Design a protein with these regions (language model features):
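Membrane-interfacial loop-to-transmembrane-helix junctions in polytopic alpha-helical membrane proteins
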Residues: 19-22, 67-73, 117, 121
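Metallo-beta-lactamase
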Residues: 140-142
């Protein structure tokens, strides 16, 4: 193999990586955030979970943070796989910007929906609801 062929292959690999990164940076960032929050101690996860009483007393961040923490490894893995499947299914049709907007609206919608319409749910964590919101967005828009 000549030097020119090696350089050509390296350029193609760099282009492929740049294209991958351009399309996947947001999804990968979300998945890394979820993995990192799994390492948090239980008392911190409790501070981030959606619990009605603290939200009623002003801890509104819980409406969003609750969806990025999980009950353990299995719960995290299931949500990561679900998010990956949905993201991969529509990768060619949706930009990272559109994914960011869809996830933002889904997270806020799920948090407010549980808080306002499901007061019987005492404690909520996980990204499942937002994944369904993103899937719905992709099916409507894509």
């Amino acid at each position: 193999m000549t030097d020119k062929e090696v350089l050509s292959q390296e350029a193609a690999a760099a282009k492929n990586f740049n294209e991958f990164f351009r399309q996947w940076w947001f999804s990968v960032s979300v998945m890394l955030l979820i993995c990192l929050t799994t390492l948090l101690p239980d008392h911190i996860i409790q501070q981030l979970a959606l619990i009605h009483a603290p939200i009623s007393h002003g801890e509104i961040w819980r409406l969003v943070t609750s969806q990025f923490v999980h009950l353990g490894f299995n719960h995290t893995l299931l949500n990561l796989v679900g998010y990956l499947i949905v993201a991969a299914s529509f990768r060619e049709d949706i930009t990272p910007r559109e994914e960011t907007i869809a996830l933002g609206f889904s997270v806020i919608g799920v948090g407010l929906g549980i808080y306002w319409f499901n007061p019987d749910i005492a404690w909520y964590v996980g990204l499942s609801g937002a994944i369904y919101g993103i899937l719905t967005h992709y099916l409507i828009v894509g």
